[in-house]
């Protein structure tokens, strides 16, 4: 378990004190903090060889763990739907993991926010036939050069095929593979583009980077993130969670209500 502040300091106090200036050096909980070179470039290199594992959840939903953000996979007669697309250099291992689930094509992709470790696979997945849906600020940030001061890195505008073709402002509902998906925008949270995805029948909840299991999330002030918004997002997640809900965090192991409670009180 990673701790970035003494136990007697609450999450709210830690965030308000600027503790996430330390977390800003970490792209993923697996730890890039010790790297002295460009952290983004290091993550891209790590992703080329990082193992991708598949965890089956329920109701035809699985999660892929790799070098970047956690990817949810919903299968069914409409083809695969993904939530997030990992780091671009992880393509071979992500593709193999998806094929290992079944041979159905990826038809739809939802981005929980614009960061490279959640949208890196957008282009190749779109070229393979997936339509891309996101909150409107994700498209805005991907459409132009965007600087993240916390990572000391400027991201060039994404290729045209990586840009979400359909966007929404606040909340959105989808019906795919016999499942109702509720998409909620947090304004702002760790960016200004964060959404969560609730697979309602399965009661599986993908939080994106509004929740990192057993770690503090990075706040991207450069693209609208805020301390208070991050806290409010955590409170909204906690208010939504049920006793039997499966929670897929942006980073870290799949958890549940106890993990969200821990995140809100530690």
Model segments located where?
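Metallo-beta-lactamase
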Residues: 56, 79-80, 87-89, 138-186, 191-192, 200-201, ...
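N-terminal secretory signal peptides
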Residues: 1-10, 20-25
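Non-globular, low-confidence helical/coil segments that flank catalytic cores
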Residues: 39, 43, 93, 100, ...
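Zn-dependent metallo-beta-lactamase
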Residues: 18-78
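Active-site metal-binding motif and surrounding structural segment of the metallo-beta-lactamase
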Residues: 54, 77-79, 89-133
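Divalent metal-coordination and catalytic microenvironments
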Residues: 60, 74, 84, 113, ...
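Conserved beta-strand hairpin/beta-sheet module of binuclear metal-dependent hydrolase folds
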Residues: 53-99, 195-199, 204-207
């Amino acid at each position: 378990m990673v701790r970035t502040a003494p136990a007697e300091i609450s999450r709210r106090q830690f965030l308000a004190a600027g503790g996430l200036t330390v977390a800003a050096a970490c792209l993923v909980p697996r730890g890039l903090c010790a790297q002295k070179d460009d952290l983004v470039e290091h993550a891209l290199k790590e992703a080329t060889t990082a193992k991708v594992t598949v965890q089956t959840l329920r109701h035809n939903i699985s999660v892929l763990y790799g070098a970047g953000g956690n990817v949810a996979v919903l299968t069914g007669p409409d083809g695969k739907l993904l939530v997030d697309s990992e780091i671009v250099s992880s393509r071979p291992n992500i593709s193999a993991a998806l094929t290992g689930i079944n041979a159905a094509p990826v038809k739809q992709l939802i981005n929980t926010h614009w960061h490279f470790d959640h949208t890196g696979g957008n282009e190749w997945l779109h070229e393979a036939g997936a339509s891309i849906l996101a909150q409107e600020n994700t498209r805005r940030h991907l459409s132009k050069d965007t600087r993240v001061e916390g990572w000391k890195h400027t991201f060039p505008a994404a290729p045209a095929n990586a840009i979400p073709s359909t966007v929404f402002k606040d909340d959105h509902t989808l019906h795919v593979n016999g499942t109702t998906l509720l998409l909620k925008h947090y304004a702002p949270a760790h960016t200004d583009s964060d959404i969560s995805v609730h697979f309602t029948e399965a009661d599986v909840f993908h939080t994106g980077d509004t929740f990192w299991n057993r770690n503090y999330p990075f706040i991207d002030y450069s693209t609208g993130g805020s301390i208070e918004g991050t806290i409010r997002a955590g409170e909204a997640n906690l208010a939504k969670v049920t006793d039997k809900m499966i929670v897929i965090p942006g980073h870290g192991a799949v958890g549940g209500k106890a993990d969200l409670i821990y995140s809100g009180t530690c």
